[in-house]
Structure formats: structure tokens, C-alpha cells
Amino acid sequence: MKLLLNILIFAITLFLYIHILFHLNTSNDLEIYQLNEPTKEKLEEVCDLKQPVLWEYPNEDLLKSINRKNLLDTYGAFDIKIRKVKYDLKNNEEMYLPYSLVNGLEAIDKHKEKIYILENNSDFIEETGLYKIFKLNDSLIRPALVSNIYYDIIFGNNTETVFKYDLNYRNYFMLTEGEIKIKLSPPKGTKYLDEIKDYENFEFRSPINPWNTKKQHLSNFDKIKCLEVTLKPKNIIYIPPRWWYSIKFISKSTVASFKYRTIMNNISISPHIIKGILQNQNIKRKITNIVN
């Protein structure tokens, strides 16, 4: 009986070790894979190589639903989150502020400095019922044994997101209108990017702008290599965990984001999850009006 128990413990330990190691492993090849109408099995196989993957995903339901005109006509009064991306977040200051979709889009379009984006809009997706549309149309990209699903809609116009990486098992970004460019960098360059681990917002970002690098950051940024890819409507890209990326919005653009975690993925990143929970237990934030 004792022998069987020891064998069982060893088997469980080995199982966990192998799967956690798989989730922690990364690939650093400066290459992006392109697919042509992949099957679910083929897509899973390629994504497990931990390299960026690009293909065309002509999903008419998503293209018709996740665009400015339809969202404004149907859900213009609902609140969405706006973020000022070109400034350093001060202590106790909120990263996101709620605005109606109408006012939020007006802010990102008309502000002279083009420093706002709309993102982190899972609440908006839930309240408007768009969650059903996302869920009905992600069967190709949703992995097996999913434990957490994060849908988002990102809006931008002639600006870019911060340079950051995600820890999720799968991260997909589909362009539904406009044009964007994405700058990607493999995980091995992290030590040169002055990484900020923001556990309050569970965001892992760099103060370096890869599109317009300041002089004080050039010596470090020149040590890393980047890929740049352009997305047109219907294009979708998979960005592996721990790969750095920044999205540049060339014009008025809308991006549908799909992020997934599995149980083993959660176990592998549990130290970060625990730190995030502890960090948010006693946080007092200051609300600042960032849009004139």
C-alpha cells in the first residue's frame, strides 16, 4: 500500500513538473509563422511552438458586430474604459477611467496629442451581451480545458499601446476595421527593457516606447531585436506568453482580443497571481480626470 502511494505521489509530481515546465518554456526565434485556413488541431500544434502566428480569419459575425458604427449605434450610451498611454502612472492613480462609448471614441479621435486608447472592456462586453458573440465565434482558437476567458475590444487612432507582455496560455488579436502594426520582441530581451511588474493592474510593461525610443533608453533598446507585422481587417495574430508587443493604430481601428488560461497555466503563474491578490487587498486609488 505504501509503495502504491509513493508511486502515485511520484506520478502526480512528475505530471505537474512536466506541464509546468511546458508553460514556463519560451521560444526566442525572431520569426513569425503564417498559416492558410488552419484547422483547430493544426493551430494548436503551431501555437505550442511558442512563436507568433498570423493568418486570415474571415469571421463575418465578428466583423459585423465588433466595429465602431455598429457599437455606436447599438451601445453608444454604455460605459467603456479609457487609458492615457503616454504618461507614467502615479501612485494610487487609476489606470482606467469610465466614459460612455460615444465620449470615449470622441476623445481618442479629437484629442490633438493622440494619447488615449480604449481597452480593458470586459465589463462593457458583459453588459451589452457581446460576450455571446465572442463565445459563439471563438471555437477555432479557444484551447481545450480552459479555466479563464478574457474578451476585450480595443479602440485606437494614430497612437500605440504600451510595450508589454501577457502570461496567458493563448493571446489572440483580430483586427475588425482599420489598420494596425504590431512590434514584437522575444522574451530574452526582457533584461534590457526596464520591466515594470504592476501587480495592481496585473500588467507587465516597459517604460520604453519601441516606436519612438527616447535617447536615455536607446543603449538598452538597441540590444534587443524586434519583428514588425501589419494587420488588415480579417487578420488575426497569436502572440505567445512572455513575448513583448505594442500595437500601433495607423488609423481609426478596432481590435477584438481573445485571451485564455488553462488550469495548468494558472498553476504555472500562481506566484504572480498571488502577488496580484495581495497587492490589491489594501489599495486606495485616486481618481484623476485625464480628458479635457
Please state what every model-predicted region is.
Residues 1-236, 244-292:
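N-terminal accessory scaffold of Fe(II)-dependent oxygenases
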